[in-house]
Amino acid sequence: MMKFKKVVVGGTFDRLHLGHKALLRKAFEVGKIVYIGLTSDDMVKNKPYAEKILPYERRLKDLIEFLEVNNFRRYRIIKINNAIGFTTRIRSLEAIVVSEETYKGALLVNRAREEVGLRPLEIIVIPIIKSKLGDKISSSLIRAGLIDPFGNPIKRE
């Protein structure tokens, strides 16, 4: 049920996995228009296994492919260079969709919005999705070669 006109979600979206997909699905479930902040190559330099993160253009292509396959049409993808991104420039945003892990980022966004006189966003939190190893599914574990994008352990030979 669409509750908001404009929602925002952000991330690196490297090697799209079940957690990313759940986050995006929730955003489209609650928002009429979804603004997606996609991190620039500069922004990901300090992430774990940064050298294995796919380049921005590839992550953008994979993200668009996922959106099209799922018939998500009402979106705008914007390159971001920091955690606040465009959230202080688009006054009409109403909500932000995050995981339990990225909840603190939503608080930073709201603080930044309030500092420039904008209304804070309603925060919608989705649970973290666990891998079959018991850890959360993360791009870092995928880049490390420990799990696949579905959370299955990768067998070493």
Swiss-Prot record:
Record Pfam families? CTP_transf_like
- GO CC annotation: cytoplasm
Per its record, the protein catalyses: (R)-4'-phosphopantetheine + ATP + H(+) = 3'-dephospho-CoA + diphosphate
Which locations, inside or outside the cell, does it occupy?
Cytoplasm
Q: What is its EC number?
A: 2.7.7.3
Keyword annotations for this protein, in alphabetical order, are: ATP-binding, Coenzyme A biosynthesis, Cytoplasm, Nucleotide-binding, Nucleotidyltransferase, Transferase
Report the SUPFAM superfamilies cross-referenced here: Nucleotidylyl transferase
Q: Which residues form the signal peptide?
A: none
Part of which pathway?
A: Cofactor biosynthesis; coenzyme A biosynthesis
GO molecular function list: ATP binding; dephospho-CoA kinase activity; pantetheine-phosphate adenylyltransferase activity
Q: Which GO terms describe its biological process?
A: coenzyme A biosynthetic process
- Highest taxon of the source? Archaea
Q: Chief localization class?
A: cytoplasm
Q: What does this protein do?
A: Reversibly transfers an adenylyl group from ATP to 4'-phosphopantetheine, yielding dephospho-CoA (dPCoA) and pyrophosphate.
What family does the entry list?
Belongs to the eukaryotic CoaD family.
PANTHER family the UniProt entry points to: BIFUNCTIONAL COENZYME A SYNTHASE-RELATED, DEPHOSPHO-COA KINASE-RELATED
Question: NCBIfam families from the entry?
Answer: CoaD_Thcocales, cyt_tran_rel, PRK00777.1
Can you state the subunit structure given in the record?
Monomer.
The name on file for this protein is: Phosphopantetheine adenylyltransferase
Q: What is the lineage of its organism?
A: Archaea, Methanobacteriati, Methanobacteriota, Thermococci, Thermococcales
